Structures are given as C-alpha cells and as structure tokens.
Amino acid sequence: LAVCDGRAADALQAQPEFESMISTEIEQIISQNIHWASKAVGTDLLQVKQGLIIPGREVVVPYMKLFCPPEQGSPIRQGTTQETTSENSQEPSLPNQKTFCIAGAGVFLGDRLIDWINEEETQGYVLIKNKARGGVIPVAYNDTRKNVSFVFRTAKARIKPILDGDKLVFDVRLKGHGEMLEQDHGVIHDFSTELPNLEKLVNQEIERRCLNTVRKSQELKSDIFGFGDLLHRLQPDIWREIADRWNEIYPTVTVNVTADFVVEHIGLTSLPLEVK
C-alpha cells in the first residue's frame, strides 16, 4: 500500500522505467529503499487495519512522487516524433512521461492522511521502530558540509516508558555497527586517533534524525511510533487513565534518544592519490 501526492489521473498514467508493470516497479522501489537505505516503510492492509483499530498507534504508509527522469536515455522520455528534414521544419516534441520515486512516508491521524515526512525523517522513524536494515548516514567532519559517509549494517532499538512523577518519558536506545563508506578529499588522515570523534558525530547525526521525526509527529499529534500502544501493553494501569486524552498528551511527552553505533572498520576509505 502506498500514497501519492497530486491527481489520481496523473498517477494512473505513470509509466514504469525498468519493469514491465508499474505495480511491480513501485514494489521494487519500496523494497530497495527498505533494505538498502531504511528510507521507506512497508505497509500492508493488515498493518493499516491494526493502526486504525489499536489505540495509541497511527498509520504510516510509503509516500510516492511522480517525476520525469532527467536522463536523456530513459525509456520513458519522449523525443521529437521524427528526425528533422530541414533546418526550418521540425516536428513538435511529445510531452515527457512520468514515473514514481520514493519521497518519504505519509502520516495518518485516525483514518485521514494529514501530512508527509521526508526521507531523512522516515529513516529516523524506521530506526526507532526497530525496522532499520541498513543505510547511509552522512556527517560533517571538520567542515560545514557533510563530507564523510557511515553505512550501518545492523540497528537495534529498545524503548522504555518511564513515569517520573507526573511526567511521562520514553527512553529510546539505539545500537548498531557499520563502517565508513566514503570520505571527501581525504579529510580523515589517522583513523586510529580520529575514530572516537567520528563515532560521536555519527551518533549525534542519528539522534538528530530520530528527534526531528519525533518532533514532527508531535506537531501533528500523530503517534506514529506506537508509544501509546507500548504504554498500554507494559503499564496498562497508567494507560487507562490517559487513553481518552492521548492525542492531547502525546505532544507533551518527553522522548529521549541515545545512539550507540560503532564504526568497526574504515571500509573502502583511503587517502586520495597524489599526483607528483
């Protein structure tokens, strides 16, 4: 199941770029982004049904966009209808057709689609939901722009609800490992000494992405993480007292995210070749 922005007629006229059927192409796009980037969610009808009927949990579905491939060699791009026969005679170009790309996830409140989260926020959502399978985290190392890429191979999340007086806190702990995938212009010269600082930057970036998603969901008053459902299962007495007001309480709860990802080795990174 997926949602697409825009007119239904435009979506129905979309063309597959690599597969024989558009439905197969959509399935492959979502699947690849789930497995290799953790920037998409896989939602079937059963999960939508559960999100609609289970208290303290909202529905999240893949969000697709229509776009025209920029590559001139794309099979769905249109050229002129025929070669020009003279300098002054030229057939008009046909309009370019469009296909789908993943653009994040659609957020529901009850049975209504209310907003979107982008791919980076979707990755934060997937990490907290313990559904991440792998992905790339770019960080800025001694620079204002992101110049080093960390690829995580495993990621595990543990969520614990804590009642501190009248304050409800959800403590999210993330753990995982991976390696450095790429660096720009050889910014890291001595991995043995700079690795601790690099791990710190990676964990800060992961925490930032997760917290941005939490803040967005709280602004929307949509508990896409199922924190309420978790509280219902682990501390039912507390849940019974606040269940009717959860949509108003959720934006006020505190969510702490702590990431502990380990850079196991430097992967394929190396110092750039120098021309002498």
PLM feature segments, named:
Residues 1-276:
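A glycine-rich, acidic short-motif signal
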